[in-house]
Structure formats: C-alpha cells, structure tokens
C-alpha cells in the first residue's frame, strides 16, 4: 500500500514538473518605478547683485600746485577748479555669507586750469609778453574689488576690502606764448593725451539692509594710481607732465541683490 502511494506521488510530480515553467511564464516580474524628484525652480541670478555709488572727494585728485606770473599786473588771471565728486556703477557676486566681489566702472570729472597774461599796456615798446593756457584732466577707472563682510548685527553689516584695476587718464592742453623782445621764445601748444596705468583701492564701510533685496552702503575708499600721468600749469612757459593721482572718497551707494 505504501509502495503504491509513493509510486503515485512520484508519477504526479513527473507530470507537473514540465508545467512549472509554463505557469511561471504567466506571471510578469514586478516593475519598480523610481519616484520623480520634487520640482525645484531654478533661481536665475542667485548670488549676483548690481550697485551704484556716488562719492564726495574732500581733497584734490590732480594737484596742480602754485602758478607763477612774470610780474604782477592788472591784466592777468589764473583759475583752478576740481569737481569734488566721483561716480561709479558695477555688478558683483556673493560667494558666501562673508566673501563677495564686484567690478566697478567709475568716472573722475577731474580738474580745469586756465591762465592768461598781457602786459602790453604797461611794458615798454617791443617788450610785451602775452600768454594763455588751458589744462583739463579727468579719468575713467575699472576696478575689481573684493570684500569680507564681518557679520550682520541688527541689519547692519560692516565690511573691509581692497581692489585692483586700471585707470585711463586724459589730459588736454592748449597754450600760447608771445615774447615781443625775443620771438625764439614764442610757442603754441596743443595736445590730447590718453594713458593707462595700474590702480588700487582700500575700502571699509557699513551696509544696511533696507528690504530683502536692497542695501544702502556708506563707505570709505582710498584710490591710488601711482603711475597715472596728468598735465599741470606752473607758469606761462611751463606745462609739465606729472605722475601719480590719489584721493579719499566718502561713498554712498545702493546694492540690489538679484535673488
């Protein structure tokens, strides 16, 4: 009896065994679909900012020095003026909460010097001297500044920084001189010279957060271009080229974060 049962079980297994793959084929393997990541909008301009500044210059950038006339007469004049402001625009980038940098293009209005002299009304015949001159100096600058923001306290962020770049100085001169006693001294000058030189800045200031994107910036900047050239007026016959310009700037600016 037991032998028959074992024989029947073996026979049933032999019959069902070929059917197993067929049955398995009726069931497809499960398909696993990865869940799509949540949509994250791309922030265009994140970290970038725009800026604009105006500055008051308490000292002269182009130092003309003293002017000397041949003698003191009524018909002589000398004037020297220099615009005491500086303006710049630029853009920058926040690398993190403490480091940032910006590139600024600036304009220095510069100075204007004029002189004139005519002693023909008082000098002996044949000895009169007539002379006049006009000098104009101004500059454009392109400076890359780097800053360290020293933390924010009640909305105020102090910072220090330094920069390096180029300055383009323009010097214009027109002058004439007539010596009735010796015509070999006569001359007429006219020049318009542009020159590029290295410049650097030292910066410090405070920024105040007005809104999420707008900051008011009150700062100090020392600007120097040791090799920049400009023209000066020393006398009716001397208009030398001098080297080196610098200034101290009290700056007021706005920064707009492009978040």
Task: Outline where the language-model segments fall.
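Short, contiguous, helix-prone interaction/anchoring segments in small proteins
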Residues: 44-90, 94, 100
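Extracellular/periplasm-exposed beta-strand and loop segments of Gram-negative cell-envelope proteins
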Residues: 58-82, 107-141, 167-197, 225-249
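Outer-membrane beta-barrel biogenesis signature
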Residues: 23-52, 63, 259
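Repeated loop/turn-to-beta-strand initiation elements of outer-membrane beta-barrel proteins
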Residues: 98-101, 154-156, 208-216
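Residues on the lipid-exposed face of transmembrane beta-strands in outer-membrane beta-barrel proteins
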Residues: 52-54, 89-93, 142-148, 162-166, ...
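Bacterial N-terminal signal peptides
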Residues: 10-18
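Bacterial N-terminal signal peptides that target proteins for export
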Residues: 1-9
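Transmembrane beta-barrel architecture of outer-membrane proteins
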Residues: 47-49, 84-86, 139-143, 157, ...
């Amino acid at each position: 009896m037991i032998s028959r049962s074992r024989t029947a079980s073996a026979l049933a297994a032999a019959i069902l065994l070929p059917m197993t793959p067929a049955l398995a084929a009726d069931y497809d393997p499960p398909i696993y679909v990865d869940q799509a990541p949540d949509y994250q909008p791309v922030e265009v301009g994140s970290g970038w900012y725009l800026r604009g500044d105006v500055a008051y210059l308490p000292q002269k950038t182009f130092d003309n020095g003293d002017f000397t006339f041949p003698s003191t007469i009524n018909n002589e004049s000398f004037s020297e003026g220099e615009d005491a402001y500086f303006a710049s625009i630029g853009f920058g980038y926040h690398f993190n909460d403490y480091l940032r940098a910006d590139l600024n293009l600036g304009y220095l209005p510069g100075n204007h010097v004029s002189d004139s002299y005519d002693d023909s009304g008082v000098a002996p015949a044949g000895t009169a001297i007539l002379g006049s001159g006009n000098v104009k100096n101004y500059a454009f600058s392109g400076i890359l500044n780097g800053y360290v923001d020293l933390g924010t306290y009640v909305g105020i962020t102090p910072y220090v920084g330094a920069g390096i770049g180029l300055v383009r100085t323009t010097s214009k001169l027109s002058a004439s001189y007539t010596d009735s006693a010796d015509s070999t001294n006569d001359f007429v000058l006219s020049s318009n010279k542009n020159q590029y030189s290295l410049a650097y800045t030292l910066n410090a200031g405070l920024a105040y957060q007005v809104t999420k994107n707008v900051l008011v910036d009150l700062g100090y900047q020392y600007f120097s271009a040791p090799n920049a050239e400009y023209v000066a007026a020393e006398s009716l016959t001397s208009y030398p080229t001098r080297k080196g310009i610098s200034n101290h700037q009290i700056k007021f600016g706005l920064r707009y974060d492009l978040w």
